[in-house]
Every structure is written in C-alpha cells, then in structure tokens.
Design a protein with these regions (language model features):
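Glycan-processing catalytic domains of CAZymes
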Residues: 1-258
Length: 258
C-alpha cells in the first residue's frame, strides 16, 4: 500500500514529501507553491497527494480570516483560534470550491475534508456544550444541503476525491442518500484520543461506524491514532490489518508527518 503520512504544518510539508517515494501524503498546502509540489511529484511519480480543506470551520491564521469572520458561529472547543462557520453562506461555498480547484492545480488528487461534524452540532445544539454563540446557528438540514452541494461539486465538476475526516452523523445520511459518492473515509481517535486510551464504548462506537462505512465504499478506511505506546500500536495495527484499514500513528497533536 506504500507509505501513509499526514502533515498539516507548513514548514514540515516539503521535507516530508521529499522523503516519500510512494504512497499517500495528506498535507495542508497553504503557503506552498504549486511549482514546488509539482517538482516533487515529477521526481516521485508514485506519490499521491490529498490536500486539506476545511469547509465548516475558520482558522484565525488563514489569510482569508478577516473576509469571512462575520460568518463565525462559535469557538471550536478543542482548537484555539478556530471557529465553526456558517457553511450555508453562498460566498463561503464558492470560496471553498475555488480553493478545491487551486489544490487540484497544485497536484492533489483528493481532499481531506474536515469538520463536517458541524451538521451534528447544529442538529443537537451548541448550547449544551456551554458554547457562547457568535451568531445564530443554521439549521442542520441547511448545513446538510450546503455540504452535499460542496461535495458533489468538488467530485463531479472539480474532479477530486473527497475523503471526509470524521462526521459520521452527517455521512450516515449522505452516504445513503448519495450512494457511491464517498469512496474513502478518515477517522481520528478510534482507539486513542490525545494520547489517552478511549473508553471501550467510544472505541466500539467508532469501530462500528468504520465498519458501516467500509461496506459502502470502494476505497480505504484510514485512521489517525494519537498514540506513542509501541505495544498498543502493535495491537491497533494488527486490528487494522485484519479489517484492511490503514492507520497512521502521530507522536504529536499537530500532524507533523513523522
């Protein structure tokens, strides 16, 4: 299956790509020129790239933050400087789709499509999590329609594979209503979250979700596990091998590609 690495830190991406000869690199190409990426791909033609796209959240560090900050819904609890965003806004949708086009032009064949859990947040409500609202949240159904539009446009018109990261509540609906569109999924923290072993119930929940999705896709189930314990890694890898899943172990909360 070749190498599998994830790197979302700008200064680490190019060194990681240069080390890889084949396999899949999942990167955030923001701030990296298409020429740089294409030069690497020319030297390593067996290397495949998926690029990061964040349709449901806005990060303060991004160059477009000021332009879209009026669409912030609430702070993202686990990441400083990140906010859930109103994906139903047409200007934002157009921007995200154009970003997908730019990423394809750089050499990506697919997207790591993050934070579709916004659908769940709008469905279940932000208030119960003690979140201070910055604007009224859109309805879950309107979020669903917006995400469906973005995904279908990116796959059918832009021509990129969409690999959602997480978002099981959204995907259980989308994959039934639009079968054969999603062909690969990514899931973080099935066994470990923030370098702590998950409860049995949480692990079983995510295992069940990944197995459900696997029956409906032709591509791979990919996991990111935040775990440094070698014995636990061995057990997880054996489980993934039995189920024909791919797994990447990260030593850091930020994905650095090591």
């Amino acid at each position: 299956m070749g190498d599998l690495r994830y790197c979302f830190e700008q200064d680490k991406v190019v060194p990681m790509l240069k080390k890889m000869k084949d396999g899949l690199a999942v990167i955030d190409s923001d701030g990296i020129s298409g020429t740089t990426i294409k030069d690497i791909l020319e030297k390593n033609p067996k290397l495949l790239i998926y690029d990061y796209l964040n349709p449901c959240a806005l990060e303060r560090e991004r160059s477009y933050y000021e332009k879209f900050k009026h669409l912030r819904i609430a702070k993202y609890a686990s990441w400083s400087g990140e906010y859930w965003i109103d994906v139903t806004n047409k200007d934002w949708q157009e921007y995200i789709i154009n970003e997908a086009r730019k990423k394809k032009a750089k050499g990506a064949i697919g997207l790591y499509f993050d934070n579709t859990d916004l659908y769940y947040m709008c469905k279940e409500g932000f208030e119960e999590k003690g979140t201070k609202m910055m604007r009224k949240a859109p309805s879950a159904n309107s979020v669903y329609k917006a995400l469906a539009h973005i995904i279908l446009t990116i796959q059918n018109d832009v021509g990129l594979v969409v690999m959602p990261n997480g978002g099981d509540v959204f995907l259980r609906r989308f994959m039934i209503e639009y079968p054969n569109v999603i062909q690969t999924i990514n899931q973080e923290g099935v066994f470990f979250e923030n370098f702590k072993k998950n409860s049995t119930s949480d692990t079983n929940y995510y295992k069940s979700w990944c197995k459900w999705a696997q029956k409906r896709i032709k591509g791979k189930v990919r996991l990111i596990e935040y775990c440094t314990d070698e014995e636990e890694q061995r057990k997880i890898k054996a489980y993934c091998t039995r189920h024909k899943w791919h797994v990447y172990f990260s030593k850091h909360k930020n994905l650095l590609g090591d």
